[in-house]
Amino acid sequence: MNKIHIFSSPRSGTHYLESLINRMLDISIVPTPFEERNAFNIDTKELSNKINEFNSIDSRVCKTHPNWLFPYDTSVEQFKYLREPDSDMLPLIRQFTEENDYTLGVIRLNIVDVTLSFALAYHNFRLTGDGTGSFRPPYNNNTVTISMEDFVENCNKILAIYEVMIAQKEIKCDKIIYYEDLTFDSSDAKLIGLNTVRTIESSVKQAKSKKETIANYDELREYAIKFFSVHQWSMKITDGVITDMDLSNLKRRK
């Protein structure tokens, strides 16, 4: 496996997994042309050229999230009920995926924890404007208060991302794992399907508990549990944790 793609729900350990694969296989971590929605600010011809350049790399590990590939512009509702990307994006997604040797799907079942983590990361991102202390280490561990208005939008966005992840049919995964099964040490190499396993020191740098860094944590968590028990159709969610979901569109047929 020389070209590995991680397709993941948000806040699900992709930074760690990229680092693990990088150290196990000695292949570079390379951002895709879709990184952080940059792709939606350039025309399709330029994006196609960037994808061709990316695909020419001999070996690499990369990651994407559903909202990078399947844009929703400014309307969460438009994204929530979208069943496939717009016609301009479809060929570009296929152009990207056809060169991957191996695609790993990663899903975090505790969707409430995902939403709280995403809300905190996005809140800190907007405070700094440069990404510091937001979506990647080093984390900003200052205690903040997140407005309920912003959090409601975050809940809608996370639900939309999960729904599109399992509804889309363009990304097929050779293996699907759950964030909750990761041990964050060398043994995860076997879990994600690597044949090469080395004993390496964990690169994980834990952030402080969300209960400590979000001043109104209890209020937000209570809202999220109620939200996800009502506002969803494609998954069974109990106390904020997904207990059943249809992954047939994600699985690659052997």
Show which residues each predicted segment covers:
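PAPS-dependent sulfotransferase catalytic domain
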Residues: 66-174, 179-197
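A general secondary-structure boundary signal
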Residues: 28-34, 100, 176-178, 239, ...
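PAPS-dependent sulfotransferase catalytic core
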Residues: 1-65, 200
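PAPS-dependent sulfotransferases, especially Golgi type II membrane carbohydrate sulfotransferases
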Residues: 3, 136-169, 182-254
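Intrinsic-disorder-associated interaction segments
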Residues: 40-44, 82, 86, 144, ...
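A periodicity- and composition-biased signal for non-globular, repetitive helical segments
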Residues: 17, 69, 211-214
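Short alpha-helical segments used as structural interaction elements across diverse proteins
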Residues: 8, 57-60, 105, 205-207, ...
